[in-house]
Swiss-Prot record:
It holds the Pfam family Defensin_4. It comes from the Eukaryota. It comes from Heteractis magnifica. It is found in: Secreted; Nematocyst. This is Pi/alpha-stichotoxin-Hmg5b. Residues 22-34 form a propeptide.
Amino acid sequence: MDYQRLLFLFAVAMVITTTVALPKDTALMDGQLQKRGTPCKCHGYIGVYWFMLAGCPNGYGYNLSCPYFLGICCVKK
């Protein structure tokens, strides 16, 4: 019984931690678009790494791309 209580408390703590740690998308609700990528290098240029995408997203003006681990690096040249 003690093991089940401990597991339950751990699960509740994880849910609370996750809801507090994840940011709310208030900027997206206001019509402002936030960049959701990390810096990467592609042919000597600094770009934005997009995880789990096969191609660069439209509407950002990317004209150079390099395949990266499980994603793509997109560059505005």
